[in-house]
Regions:
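A short, proline-enriched helix->beta-strand linker immediately N-terminal to the Walker B motif
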Residues: 151-155
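ABC ATPase "signature
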Residues: 217-218, 226, 313
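Short helical segment in ABC ATPase nucleotide-binding domains corresponding to the A-loop/adjacent helical element
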Residues: 92-101, 111, 115, 204
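Conserved ABC ATPase "signature" C-loop
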Residues: 211-212
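Helix-to-loop junction immediately C-terminal to a conserved catalytic motif
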Residues: 48
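Conserved ABC ATPase "signature" region
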Residues: 108-127
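Conserved ABC ATPase signature
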Residues: 131-136, 140
Length: 334
């Protein structure tokens, strides 16, 4: 879907981006990760030509973006920034309708799209369409920013640290909301971040930047389990093995209670009818599960599906054994 080929950007004698190449498949979320000033945002802005490359090429769906009209290109790509960038003198509805209006959409069609998108980003259209940005919280503004980026149904979205200015509690919730939206709309997303946990949580693939170059490109698990250099290992952190727990979910290691020597009682619908020390959801990542087990002082948890039906038990020993086994395998491969 997106192919970056030998991309460079120089400002006189200063090289901001040097010979960057990678590919992102349709429907993937690719996080451009790295410290400040490493070329992440410059690379992102060369994709929609807010910054013109010194050399190299960007292809979207097989088309060389240098051969496209820059304004038309930008209108065909969703763009979300940390500062949100909503027009303060325009209502939420008018903000969302900016690109559809520029593309000549019928006014009624644009308004229907605005209402539809607010519902997608979990904002009640009857309450928020006529509000102004100053009447919204930071998290609500960010959701409207995402809705605006989706307004013309672009195949590609570029996001420059979109959640960086939001407090940690709301940021985690909005990340979850964005992932839910992405499962629904299936866009190809390039996402700038310096937050390792955010990259691990959200990315299908990660481009780790260092001083204008890509140090390593791969899945979050690749970077955590098999860092390609000392820089990659240091950047991913000394706790990178624990970070891998975010990539695994409770359901994946839930085992039969009887086989684990644990007695539980179920009702006729398969729901728990007895007390258990801890309940976790099938989709909870293993870092959440392990943290909850330690907080509760228990070595196991009951794993439940979205309908509260019992799936099995998650043993703390299985979490640790699974992680250790994967780590040993990763070391042997390297």
């Amino acid at each position: 879907m997106i192919r970056i080929q030998n991309l460079c950007k120089r400002y006189g004698a200063v090289t901001a981006v040097e010979d960057v190449s990678f590919e992102v498949q349709e429907g993937q979320v690719c996080v451009l990760l790295g410290p400040s000033g490493c070329g992440k945002t410059t690379t992102l802005k060369m994709i929609n030509r807010l910054i013109e490359p010194t050399s190299g090429k960007v292809f979207i769906a097989g088309r060389d973006t240098a051969e496209l009209d820059s304004v038309t290109l930008r209108r065909s790509i969703g763009y979300v920034i940390q500062q949100v960038g909503l027009f303060p003198n325009m209502t939420v509805e008018d903000n969302i309708c900016v690109v559809p209006n520029l593309l000549g959409w019928d006014k009624a069609q644009s308004r229907r799209r605005a209402a539809e998108l607010l519902e997608i980003v979990a904002l009640d259209s009857s309450l928020f369409l006529k509000r102004y940005p100053r009447e919204l919280s930071g998290g609500q503004q960010q959701r409207v920013g995402v809705a605006r980026a989706l307004a013309a149904d672009p195949p590609v979205m570029l996001m420059d640290e979109p959640f960086g200015a939001i407090d940690p509690i709301n940021r985690d919730a909005i990340q979850d909301e964005f992932m839910r939206i992405q499962r629904q709309v299936n866009k190809t997303v390039l996402f700038v971040s310096h937050d390792i946990d955010e990259a691990v949580k959200m990315a299908d693939c990660v481009a780790l930047f260092r001083a204008g170059n890509i140090e390593q490109f791969g899945s979050p698990d690749d970077l955590l389990a098999r860092p390609a250099s000392d820089f990659a290992a240091d950047f991913m952190g000394s706790d990178r093995i624990l970070k891998r727990l975010r990539l695994m979910h409770a359901e994946s290691i839930a085992r039969d209670a009887g086989a684990a020597g644990i007695a539980v009682e179920l009702d006729r619908d398969g729901r728990l009818a007895s007390q258990v020390p801890l309940r976790v959801r099938a989709a909870d990542d293993l870092r959440q599960v392990l943290s909850a087990q330690l907080a509760k002082g228990t070595s196991w948890a009951a794993c439940l599906d979205k309908d509260q039906r019992f799936l099995g038990v998650v043993l703390q020993s299985d979490i640790l054994a699974n992680l250790t086994q994967d780590t040993v395998a990763a070391r042997q491969e390297s």
